[in-house]
Amino acid sequence: MKISANSIRTGNILVYNNDLWVVSKTPEHTQPGKGGAYVQVEMKNLKTGTKRNDRFSSSDYLEKAELEQKDCQFLYFEGNNLVLMDTKHFDQINVPKEILEAKLPFLTENMIVKVEFYNDKPLTIVLPPTVILAISETDPVIKGATVTSSYKPAILENGIKVKVPQYLAIGEKIVVKTDDMTYVERAK
């Protein structure tokens, strides 16, 4: 599917120079005083991991990869692979761990994730926007600390470090964003 260079967004997967590239930063739209408007795009090759910056005229059209998305349930780790089960057809799928990269610690047993396929090959895994995790290490609660803008460091049950409000203690469950690993709220 062709899309305008102005329509490119972070996370889009493009077919460019016969390779698949993911847009890794928000594209910069520029209108210089002289010449035509252009879009500066930072992309990462999904096969090799190399990054590149390209400039496209705002009138250019690029090929956006048509991805098939399936809901899958995470079952277990097997070597360097994740074993997932298609929730519709109950087929088991092996996906390399590298696909998740830094988001791997958020993956919990039986979690439902979205797997995006290109030509029947798994490309990306989309985690839920938030997860509930328990605090395993943090400084003690300060008596009288209310909801303020001051935060303290905490380590969660999956090993991720986040900043949490002063009033939270070890063992409490919190909601964390999976995209930027930040605290949202105390779990209800």
UniProtKB/Swiss-Prot annotation:
Phylogenetic placement of the source organism: Bacteria, Pseudomonadati, Pseudomonadota, Alphaproteobacteria, Rickettsiales
Sequence similarity: Belongs to the elongation factor P family.
Annotated organism of origin: Rickettsia prowazekii (strain Madrid E)
Location in or out of the cell: Cytoplasm
Record Pfam families: EFP (PF01132), EFP_N (PF08207), Elong-fact-P_C (PF09285)
This protein's encoding gene: efp
Highest taxon listed in the record's lineage: Bacteria
Keyword RNA-binding annotated: no
Protein name: Elongation factor P
Cited NCBIfam families: efp, PRK00529.1
Function: Involved in peptide bond synthesis. Stimulates efficient translation and peptide-bond synthesis on native or reconstituted 70S ribosomes in vitro. Probably functions indirectly by altering the affinity of the ribosome for aminoacyl-tRNA, thus increasing their reactivity as acceptors for peptidyl transferase.
One GO BP: peptide biosynthetic process
Signal peptide extent: none
Keyword Isomerase found: no
Involved pathway(s): Protein biosynthesis; polypeptide chain elongation
Primary subcellular site in the record, as a coarse category: cytoplasm
GO cellular component, one term: cytoplasm
